[in-house]
Amino acid sequence: MLHTNNTQFHPSTFLVVGVPGLEDVHVWIGFPFFAVYLTALLGNIIILFVIQTEQSLHQPMFYFLAMLAGTDLGLSTATIPKMLGIFWFNLGEIAFGACITQMYTIHICTGLESVVLTVTGIDRYIAICNPLRYSMILTNKVIAILGIVIIVRTLVFVTPFTFLILRLPFCGVRIIPHTYCEHMGLAKLACASINVIYGLIAFSVGYIDISVIGFSYVQILRAVFHLPAWDARPKALSTCGSHVCVMLAFYLPALFSFMTHRFGHNIPHYIHILLANLYVVFPPALNSVIYGVKTKQIREQVLRILNPKSFWHFDPKRIFHNNSVRQ
């Protein structure tokens, strides 16, 4: 039952209603979400394929890009298919375990993305401020250690949020006025008080990531403007263009969503929901487009693969050779 007066720690189901106030246009809302999902799916799969098959792209920067693409695939797949089920087929009912799993996956993916963007900022800092030692600093061993640190840090900060929800008793209405199982939407259905400490921790972690990225770019700008040759400055800054665009695509929707939730009390509720969707739906698609367009190595390899002449002259022995070299 979705409506009950009994207090339960683990109710059987919740009802995710979609975008409150826009139920009549759910079918039409689903089409841009579907297009965004296809873009995210195809774009990130292509990026992973290109990085895996092209030996010239086996560099730290592209390893981090592969991590980002994998994270984007997880985030978009954890959210958009269920949204489309709600928009097109009214499949809003979701089991408690599935709802918790979706919430946990969203937290994991957004946490991973934030850390990967932070590490990528450090990568750009080393590449521009200390280029001669770049390959000596970011060795394969260091990249592997950074990958482990990224995963461990995300798990350490995200897992407590899930245990907090599991400890809360739920009573009354089981309706979530959202398009996915959002943490605060679930917490508001609880009969117990919400511990704000976890929210402060999440905000602090995000602030630390942004601060590290900001410090990296301050140092990058200082190094660039100290270059003796004027024509070298735009070239140096262009290597950071993709990362800056991806960073803005990730953090700006989150900032707008937070600001409207905190201060926009007179803003219609459906605006809050749509902004929250921007935060989890659009970055995975935008990231693949941004890196595909602005990163020369990725763009050239994608065009070569999509070129019919290159396709018919595609030599599978080259991929086998690349894999043999790595082994």
From Swiss-Prot:
- Mind listing the UniProt keywords for this protein, alphabetically? Cell membrane, Disulfide bond, G-protein coupled receptor, Glycoprotein, Membrane, Olfaction, Receptor, Sensory transduction, Transducer, Transmembrane, Transmembrane helix
Q: Superkingdom of this entry's organism?
A: Eukaryota
Family per UniProt?
Answer: Belongs to the G-protein coupled receptor 1 family.
Question: Can you supply one Gene Ontology CC term for this chain's record?
Answer: plasma membrane
In the UniProt record, which residues carry a glycan?
A: 5
Q: GO molecular function, one example?
A: G protein-coupled receptor activity
The way this protein sits in the membrane is described as: Multi-pass membrane protein
Q: What does this protein do?
A: Odorant receptor.
All disulfide bonds of the chain are 99-191
Q: Where are the transmembrane segments?
A: 31-51, 57-77, 102-122, 145-165, 196-216, 239-259, 273-293
Protein name as it appears in the record: Olfactory receptor 52E5
Q: Which CDD domains match?
A: 7tmA_OR52E-like (cd15952)
Q: According to its UniProt record, where is this protein located?
A: Cell membrane
Matching entries from InterPro entries are given as:
GPCR_Rhodpsn, GPCR_Rhodpsn_7TM, Olfact_rcpt, OR51/52/56-like
Hey, which stretches end up on the Extracellular side? 1-30, 78-101, 166-195, 260-272
Which intervals lie on the Cytoplasmic side per UniProt?
52-56, 123-144, 217-238, 294-327
